[in-house]
Amino acid sequence: MLPCAVMGEFRGTISYATRTRRLKAGSLIRVISGIYWEGELESPAAVTELVAALTRHGYALTAVSLYQFYCSQPISLPVHVSTERRITSTKYVVAHHVKRLRTVAVRGVLTECGVDAVKHLPDKKAIALLDLAYSGRHGSAVLRRESPMRVSARVKTLVNRAAVGADSVPERILVRALREAGLECTSNFRVGVYFWDVKLRDYNIVIEVDGYFYHNAGAENKNTFVNDRWKMNDAAVRGYLVLRYPASSVFEELDTIVGQVIFATRVVREELVVVDSTRRWHRGPWEWLPLDSW
């Protein structure tokens, strides 16, 4: 390729003959239908700019490129995109044709909805993508909103294997281990005004996985310390059996944790307690504790 002082999408207007001549000379690259490029296309900065150009032209990131994006990994060439158009792939961009493209903007990048993109991935990466695309407190609701009316049996299986709603790697590891032990779980389960990392679906057991930095930064983060104690008390008086584990134990003693959770299912109470929700200890302490207590 001839050296070029600029790098990025070519947006100028040139004649067909000039474009053909530049393509042959290597000073212009056709990366995909509608997008021509000046300069190198190998560096991370160039690929990042290419992704931005693809977004501008309505191409949605998908497959392994979307997996890399969610995992905060450098996106490698060729970039994989989904489009409703039938176009030819190149060495720089692989185009996946879909009948109906459903997209969502993530950090300024146009992406195919995760539940649709997994069809282009092997199982392990597909599950990891679902974990990240539908993480957090609203993950389950987002998944329901983005799921098409009909999904393949494989996608259903992948969704069931993903730890939808979990916030962290330790939580996902624990959820999968409990499922393998026959215990179905819900992540980010609400009890009163609080959210718990894990709730066993068939038992009144809630589980919290504590990360060291979250609970020791700044004040143990004094606010977190105070909030956690009232949170535990609230669940306990409602009739839940509360279990808490440090994230380090999930990595080091996972089998022991699972064994204890299984035993807990034998002793947990079957009925919850009806509480007077007007009492202030069933509201968050941030609403009624003096500021100097935080």
Regions found by a protein language model. Name each.
Residues 134-294:
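Surface segments flanking catalytic/ligand-binding clefts of nucleic-acid enzymes
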